[in-house]
Amino acid sequence: YVDAANIRLLKEEIARRFGAMVNNESSVYMVFKGTLNEMLTKVESINNQCFSVMMDYKSPNMPEERASAYAAVSAIEFQKDPARQIAGLELVGDLPAKEELRAEERNMLLEAGIATVIVNANGNTAIEREATTYRKNSAGATDNSYFDMTTTQTAIYMRYSWKERIQQKFQRYKLADDNYEVQPGQKVVTPKVLTGEIIALAEDWLAAGLVEDISSFKNTILTMLDDNDTERLNQLLQPNPMNNLRIVAGKLQFIS
C-alpha cells in the first residue's frame, strides 16, 4: 500500500482524523524498499508530519515486516514519552542488510524526509533517526518544524491533554466576560480563568519534559470570546516543544 493512490487516500484519512470535529490523531509508518534514488524520488510527494517512512536498502526483510517493527517500537516508546527520541532502539526480528548506505547517503535520505537505520555493534538493525516526511510548508518553502516524529507526537499529546483538562474541569460551566465577578460556588468560567488553567497545564508539560520556556509561552497565550458565537471561547497556544540531543560538535586544538 505504498503506491501513489493509496498514499493519497492515507493522507486524506489522516487529515480527516486530525480535524477539530474528529480528534482521532493517527500516525502512519511505512517502509520504502529500493535504491537511494528510488527512495528519494518516492518520498517527494508525501510531505506530511504524520507519516514516517523508513529506508530499506538491500535488506532481506519484507517491507511490511520492517514497518511493523518500526510502528511497534514507536507506539510503545512514544506512549511513555512522546518527546523522547527513539534513536538507537533495535527493530526486533529485523534482518540487517549486508551492505549499508554511507553516512552521507543516509543524511540525504533524512533531509528528504526518510527515517534511517544502522547496523549496531551487536549486528542488529537499529533506528538512527525517526524522521517524518514533512519538509515544506503550504507555500512551498523549506520548513523543519516537523522534521522528527517526536515533534508530531508531542503536539498530539498536548492537544489531547488540553482537551481532557477542559472537559474534566469545566463540564456544564457557564461562560462570562472577564468583567464578570465570579462568586464562590458559581459554575462560571471567564477567559482569564481559562488562561490560568492552560498555564497550569503547561507547568505539567514542563515537569514532564515535553516543553521549555514557559515564560514566553505565557506571554503568547490568547484567550477571547468569539465575536460570532456568544457561547464559544477561542484560545491560541504556542508552546515550545522539547528538543533532543542528536549531534555534539566539538573542536580539539593545541595550545598556541
What would you call each of these model-derived segments?
Residues 1-94:
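A glycine-rich, acidic short-motif signal
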Residues 83-256:
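Structured, hydrophobic secondary-structure cores that serve as assembly/anchoring elements
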